[in-house]
């Protein structure tokens, strides 16, 4: 399987040895590849470098919406260069976050539009962070013209929101919160996503799935979310694992793997 969104640096990885050890733990649990995701320029540089240390690691680069206040000039130039690196497979995470008050909405929206254009320029998927901003995210995608591949990372909407995304051809990635007992509307959404548009992720070190909610998360924990989703959707674990692996390979252009 592919962990479609994780943060190896935030999990504690610092160098080739620690990256290898973390991905070894993941592979022992059936997670054969990971996409480590940036939230600022420093982590974007690290992610792009980490993806050269281990063939199982790929990178996504962007500036997180809560960190967009100082996103201009040199930072944008650096991100454009990183986005073209061959081991960088997505532009993310970008989008809108109206929960935290770290960056004004208009600043976030301008940065989001810029990332959308970058995604189209380099021909790589757009990986979206959407927190309490569903309508504005969808509106801006419509206004700007969505890239060919759009991923809603750690999807947090209900079934109605999911249906809108599905109709638009977007990919929905589910993380640990779908396993939480009170996440009924999210679980309803997860039931209706076609396999060809379904991804799974850890968003580690955050949002550890049940039964280990509240403890540190790592890519190896993806298996708990996959097992839960399989039960929720009424399919076998192997069937779901195969489906989400195929979707991830197609979205990120990873090529076929003999392992799931």
List each language-model region with its residue ranges.
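Mid-domain alpha/beta scaffold segments of enzyme catalytic cores
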Residues: 1-260
């Amino acid at each position: 399987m592919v962990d479609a969104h994780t943060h190896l640096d935030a999990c504690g990885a610092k160098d080739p040895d620690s990256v290898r050890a973390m991905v070894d733990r993941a592979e022992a649990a059936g997670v054969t590849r990971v996409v480590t995701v940036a939230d600022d320029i420093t982590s974007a540089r690290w992610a792009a470098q980490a993806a050269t240390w281990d063939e199982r690691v790929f990178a996504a680069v962007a500036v997180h919406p809560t960190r967009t206040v100082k996103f201009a000039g040199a930072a944008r130039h650096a991100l454009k260069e990183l986005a073209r690196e061959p081991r960088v497979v997505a532009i993310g995470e970008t989008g809108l976050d109206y929960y935290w008050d770290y960056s004004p909405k208009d600043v976030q929206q301008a940065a989001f539009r810029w990332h959308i254009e970058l995604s189209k320029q380099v021909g790589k998927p757009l990986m979206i962070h959407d927190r309490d901003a569903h309508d504005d995210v969808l509106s801006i995608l419509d206004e700007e013209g969505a890239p060919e591949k759009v991923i809603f990372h750690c999807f947090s909407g209900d079934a109605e929101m999911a249906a809108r995304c599905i109709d638009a051809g977007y990919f929905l990635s589910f993380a640990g919160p779908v396993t939480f007992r009170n996440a009924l509307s999210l679980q309803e959404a997860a039931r209706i996503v076609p396999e060809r548009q379904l991804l799974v992720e850890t968003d580690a070190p955050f949002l550890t799935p049940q039964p280990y909610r509240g403890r540190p998360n790592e890519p190896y924990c993806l298996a708990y979310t996959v097992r839960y989703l399989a039960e929720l959707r009424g399919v076998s674990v192997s069937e779901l694992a195969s489906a989400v692996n195929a979707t991830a390979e197609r979205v990120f252009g990873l090529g076929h793997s003999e392992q799931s």
